[in-house]
Swiss-Prot record:
Subunit structure, as described in the record: Homodimer.
GO biological process: homoserine metabolic process; methionine biosynthetic process
Residues annotated to bind substrate: R224, D353
Places the protein is found: Cytoplasm
Pathway assigned to this chain's UniProt record: Amino-acid biosynthesis; L-methionine biosynthesis via de novo pathway; O-succinyl-L-homoserine from L-homoserine: step 1/1
Residues annotated as the enzyme's active site: S154, D319, H352
Site (described: Important for acyl-CoA specificity): R321
Superkingdom of the organism of origin: Bacteria
Keywords, in A-Z order: Acyltransferase, Amino-acid biosynthesis, Cytoplasm, Methionine biosynthesis, Transferase
Protein name per its UniProtKB record: Homoserine O-succinyltransferase
Origin species: Aromatoleum aromaticum (strain DSM 19018 / LMG 30748 / EbN1)
UniProt similarity note: Belongs to the AB hydrolase superfamily. MetX family.
Function: Transfers a succinyl group from succinyl-CoA to L-homoserine, forming succinyl-L-homoserine.
């Protein structure tokens, strides 16, 4: 058996689309570009393609590294590659940066052809359904009529679910990890607090901060700090940080004293250094809006009747952001429609971020599922 290996050095590719893309909001993008990466080789039948959809802070860079930046490892590198659960000896894997993103795909920092200036806050709202429509156009460009599977964790899982509804004939399997059919009110509340942190930053300038040569780093930092709290479980925080004081005793100040404070500030500063605030706003709104049951009277099983793919749904025991109950809601609705669905709840103390980690049980489960997919 081959030892798991990296896909090695990878090169992003760019696809330009001159045809306008109609959006769910009623608006349209006149033209746009998608940045993507591929791993493995497309077979002669063009039947082994797998699309990996990213979550809020992810990108097209799913696996491997860049020759000029070897430390920049793909966000799901532990899952994708030769001998890994999503084995690139068998599958042709594609990662795409979503519309509105900040990693090379057309987004708020891109130039608005109508004004010659960055889009900023004028960039149209995009939804999960819009992302999937753009991904389908990329598949057309690559000559892929049908994906063997569409895979995603968290928000990526929502995209995989939407694929089964928007293009049921173009997807064989959907793998939804740590995901949900819609956000709870609590999740929408977290997103709103994060957005307000950005919107209230004096450097936000109504979303047109590019023209002022500044970024709303303070607001974006606070938004990320809040997000990180929800990505971790109470047990994970206790095990990793506890109540440890950096100086061994209280110094009675508002500066960093507890290790958890140091961690959150570090994560916030790091995120604010590379992510775009307008992209954060757009992406959290896309999360909030996603609800395939809305047009079916709130009845999920009615919404999922259109799906024909086989499903693997995975949740994690301590994930309270996208709890196992939300995954089971998807499973029950699929079973109601007599669809083929496998479900697993993985014991993990890492919370929502478990879907990114190299957990043996989790990876064995995914490997077994992908192994039985016929291409």
């Amino acid at each position: 058996m081959i030892q798991p290996q990296s896909v090695g050095a990878v090169v992003p590719q760019r696809a330009h689309f001159a045809e306008p893309l109609p959006l769910r909001s009623g608006d349209a993008l006149p033209e746009y570009e998608l940045l993507y990466e591929t791993y493995g080789e497309l077979n002669a039948a063009r039947s082994n393609a797998v699309l990996v959809c990213h979550a809020l802070s992810g990108s097209h860079h799913v696996a491997g590294h860049y020759a000029d930046d070897p430390g920049n490892i793909g966000w799901w590198d532990n899952l994708v590659g030769p001998g890994k659960p999503l084995d690139t000896r068998k599958f042709f894997v594609i990662g795409v940066n979503n519309l509105g993103g900040c990693h090379g795909t057309t987004g708020p920092a891109s130039i608005n052809p109508a004004s010659g200036k960055p889009w900023g806050a004028d960039f149209p709202f995009v939804t999960v359904e819009d992302w999937v429509a753009a991904q389908a156009r990329l598949a057309d460009r690559l000559g892929i009529e049908r994906f063997a599977a569409v895979v995603g964790g968290s928000l990526g899982g929502m995209q995989a679910l939407s694929w089964t509804l928007q293009y049921p004939e173009r997807i064989g399997h959907a793998v939804l990890v740590a995901s949900a059919p819609r956000l709870t009110a609590q999740n929408i509340a977290f997103n709103e607090v994060a957005r307000q942190a950005i919107l209230s930053d004096p450097d936000f300038h109504g979303g047109h901060y590019y023209e002022h040569g500044v970024v709303p780093a303070r607001g974006l930092k606070l938004a990320r700090m809040l997000g990180h709290i929800t990505y971790l479980s109470d047990d994970a925080m206790a095990d990793k940080f506890g109540r440890t004081l950096r100086h061994g005793k209280a110094v009675y100040s508002y500066d960093v004293e507890f290790e958890i404070e140091s961690y959150l500030r570090y994560q916030g500063d790091k995120f604010a250094g590379f992510f775009d605030a307008n992209t954060y706003l757009l992406t959290t709104k896309a999360l909030d809006y996603f609800d395939p049951a809305f047009e079916h009277g709130g009845i999920l099983r009615a919404a999922l009747a259109r799906a024909s793919a086989d499903f693997l749904v995975v949740s994690f025991s301590t994930d309270w952001r996208f709890s196992p109950a939300r995954s089971r809601e998807i499973v029950y609705s699929l079973l109601h429609n007599r669809r083929n669905v496998s479900y697993a709840e993985i014991e993990s103390d890492a919370g929502h971020d478990s879907f990114l980690l190299d957990d043996a049980h989790y990876h064995e489960l995914l490997a077994a599922y992908f192994d039985r997919i016929e291409v």
